[in-house]
Amino acid sequence: MSPVLPRHDIEFPTLDGITLRGWLYPATKRGPGMILSPGFNMPKDAIIPDICKWFQERDITCLAWDPRGIGASDGEPRNDIDPRQEAEHLHDAVTWLSKNPLVDVTKIALWGLCFGGNVTLAAAALEYVLNGSPFSSPPCFVVPSWADIDLTLSKRIAAMISVAPLIDSTGLPERRQPILELAMYDRAGRLEGDDPMYLPYVNEDGSVPNGLQLAADMMPALDRLGIPVENRVTVQTYYRALTWSVLNLVEYIAPTPAMMVTPEFDVSCPTKDQLKAYERMGEPKELDILKGKGHLDWIFGDVDIILNRQLDFLKRQMNF
């Protein structure tokens, strides 16, 4: 393993005028870079730092970032989550990381956990660039016709890894109408100057407002670990979740090499949903089933074995 340099604070702009912030974990030499996205309503502090350090020690410059309205990043209302916008902001993160002298622009990967895994799938599906050039085009660039576009080497992302991704964010059917009613009430109130309406991120029994189920002790555990997670999410977050389906995008990830890491007994982000998404993905792709593991308990015990499989995938696909 290589010696570790200290992480440092960074910030980057987005096309829609927001400043996002994160931590850069620089490798000791020029080489691949990877952007790591946290789970739903989670700051970069949750799990991601340990993963970044692990890959940093193996010569990958890593960027952990706070999505809009979370943690240190700008954006109002706070805890107002939009998967489509988060995917767009990942594009801006790629652009920012590509300018770092430690990063080979032909070897940039995406890594996402849970909801971050969903957004990573979407961003990888949409990451194209004209004429096979990774990041640049002349000012006021105009394509005279589709015949002039060369798409042979058109993906900016060299590889992607999606870990325990949340695939279906719509929740239980019986929760649909109440969420929509609250969302319309909230919209009308905000037009009159009211503050945004919030719901708990996780209830005491581990349930989520749209009916999904998380561990009942999740929030107390995060608090004990000192991870600053706000236990609230805007009603509009769940409205947007009803309109979002990453399954419509995953077939477009190819030809970007993709790895899906799926816990065998994932209840929070059901294993069957992850496998359904994987089936729709084109080649090249690899599936790593974490035998006997649930949504997050893979981070305890044999995590080195799991991450080494991911490192092997990245080395083979990005040639480093």
UniProtKB/Swiss-Prot annotation:
Induction: The fujikurins gene cluster is specifically expressed during rice infection. The keyword Nucleotide-binding does not apply. Pfam families: Abhydrolase_6. Keywords: Transferase. GO terms for molecular function: transferase activity. Its EC number is 2.3.-.-. Disulfide bonds: none annotated. It is an enzyme of class 2 (transferase). InterPro entries: AB_hydrolase_1, AB_hydrolase_fold, Polyketide_trans_af380. Residues 58-298 are annotated as: Abhydrolase domain. PANTHER family: DLTD N-TERMINAL DOMAIN PROTEIN (AFU_ORTHOLOGUE AFUA_8G00380)-RELATED, SUPERFAMILY HYDROLASE, PUTATIVE (AFU_ORTHOLOGUE AFUA_2G16580)-RELATED. Belongs to the polyketide transferase af380 family. Polyketide transferase; part of the gene cluster that mediates the biosynthesis of fujikurins A-D, secondary metabolites playing a role during rice infection. The polyketide synthase PKS19 acts with the trans-enoyl reductase FFUJ_12240 and the polyketide transferase FFUJ_12241 to produce fujikurins, however, the biosynthesis pathway has not been identified yet. This is Polyketide transferase FFUJ_12241. It comes from Gibberella fujikuroi (strain CBS 195.34 / IMI 58289 / NRRL A-6831) (Bakanae and foot rot disease fungus).
